[in-house]
């Protein structure tokens, strides 16, 4: 069973309030070899211009960085949007810890040897299902 530990950041997100409608869940991987706790700490740092609502790995703790009713900066606008309707304003972002076969290319998010442990995937499925139920999000919006 997963436990959510709040590590709410004080910057790098937008306050939205109770009226925010959550329609999507966006799943990312870190692009680095750090733990979920380390990435949560990274988001809390200076002017990152990025954040996610949650960070998880193979451990039993999910770190919450941004309250669900606020807007994390995870979908990106620097290169435009990929999805026609999913935006930071209507989604929850989850960052997931990857592993890498060739650690000498760890700085390359485009490398094709990133992978997830079975426990990490199990945690992600469990946590994503809980969010889907909480916000009535259909599978096609994940």
Region locations from a protein language model:
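Short glycine-rich phosphate-binding loop at a beta-alpha junction
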Residues: 140-142
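Active-site-adjacent loop/helix surface patches within enzyme catalytic domains
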Residues: 2-138
């Amino acid at each position: 069973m997963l436990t959510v530990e709040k590590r709410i950041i004080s910057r790098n997100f937008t306050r939205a309030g109770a009226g925010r409608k959550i329609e999507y869940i966006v799943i990312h991987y870190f692009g680095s070899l750090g733990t979920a706790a380390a990435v949560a700490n990274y988001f809390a740092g200076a002017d990152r211009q990025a954040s996610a609502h949650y960070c998880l790995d193979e451990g039993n703790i999910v770190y919450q960085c941004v309250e669900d009713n606020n807007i994390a900066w995870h979908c990106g606008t620097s290169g435009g949007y990929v999805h026609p309707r999913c935006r930071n304003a209507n989604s929850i972002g989850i960052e997931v810890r990857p592993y890498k076969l060739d650690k000498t290319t760890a700085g390359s998010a485009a490398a094709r040897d990133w992978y997830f442990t079975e426990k990490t995937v199990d945690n992600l499925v469990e946590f994503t299902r809980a969010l889907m139920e909480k916000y009535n999000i259909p599978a096609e919006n994940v």
